[in-house]
Amino acid sequence: PTEVSCDYVFVCHMRRYKNVVNQPVKKIITSNLREAKEYDHMLNFASYSCQEPAIMENSGLMCLHFLMHMGIAKVSIAGLDGYDITNRGNYVNSGLEYDFTAEQLQERNELIAKEISALQEKMEIDFLTDSIYKR
């Protein structure tokens, strides 16, 4: 959102990149964004993506993997609240919504929870907003 000030934006989807390309913020992108021209840092997609195909491109998880790789011991995160299986209002910007079935959303929630649990064994994750992934 434009009303939130930040130093960097982490992007691994071209659709989201197009929303931030002209914003005055530093961009960290992943190597799968072959058409991207305006960025500050590019990371190897395969190095930080999840093994599970259903959540392979989850930007929140990719960012957490990157931060862990950088040696960050504690992360505070907002907005990683989990998918609403009714598939309504999962994103602040409705233009970023995906068309998933309730079963797909439930599977994603379970896989993300498992991945976050594994990450929490290596780093402290503090959820600033309500999240189904908070343990």
Locate predicted features.
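Metal-ion/cofactor- or nucleotide/acyl-coenzyme-handling active-site neighborhoods
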Residues: 1-135
